[in-house]
Amino acid sequence: MHHAKKDDIEKIMNIFKANRKWFPHVREYHIKTRIERNQVILEDDVVITYHYYTRNQPLSKKDKEGNDIGKKVMAEKGDCILHQIVKDKESKSKASDVLQKFFKTVKSNKVYLSVRSENEVAIKFYLRNGMKLVGRTTWSEGKMPGNIYLYENHLYVKPPEEIKVKKVKVKKTKKVATLEAHLEF
């Protein structure tokens, strides 16, 4: 996978502008920041923005009355959140191929994303690519409903946590010169 570079910003922003209906909130400074953090992939005219959670993070939210809108979904530290995937409309490349490659290279067992409930094209795309609906969310103070999807990456093996070894003082003993002296009690 090719992480985007600063020189790619114009191309990336043009792809987002062509898809303004679904990404009206994406700003250039936001993409520049993500590029600096190696959180933007540009491959075959497909853009993916993502990051790894540094702490446990609730993904499901409440409706405008403050009620839970379904099962609570909690991402754990180290899980991946895919923020956006968008393709150049003029390109013949397949976003599905790029997404599958992303799934194979991401360093996480779980990849989450949320999408507006009305975005049927995206929802069908996510389902075709092995994601499962796991919860609901909202934006704009509960006015814009969304779905939470999860891809479980069984190819990634999480490294074991660092093992902390406690230092112990070793008691020095007298050296024994002969076998007979060693065997005496």
What feature does the model see in each segment?
Residues M1-V26:
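Short amphipathic alpha-helix that is part of the acyltransferase structural core
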Residues R20-V40, T49-H51:
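Active-site rim helix/loop that mediates acceptor-substrate recognition in acyltransferases
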Residues S91-T105, K124, R128:
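Conserved acetyl-CoA-binding loop-helix of GNAT-fold acetyltransferases
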Residues L113-I123, W139-M144:
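Conserved beta-strand-loop-alpha-helix junction that forms the acyl-donor binding cleft
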Residues F16, Y126, M131:
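Conserved active-site tyrosine of GNAT-family acetyltransferases
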Residues M1-D7, P160-I163, F185:
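Conserved N-terminal entry element of GNAT/NAT acetyltransferase domains
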Residues T49-Q84, E90, S140-P145:
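Conserved acyl-donor/pantetheine-binding loop and adjacent beta-alpha core of acyl/acetyltransferases
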Residues R37-L42, V47, Q84, Y112, ...:
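Short hydrophobic/aromatic beta-strand element in the GNAT-like acyltransferase core
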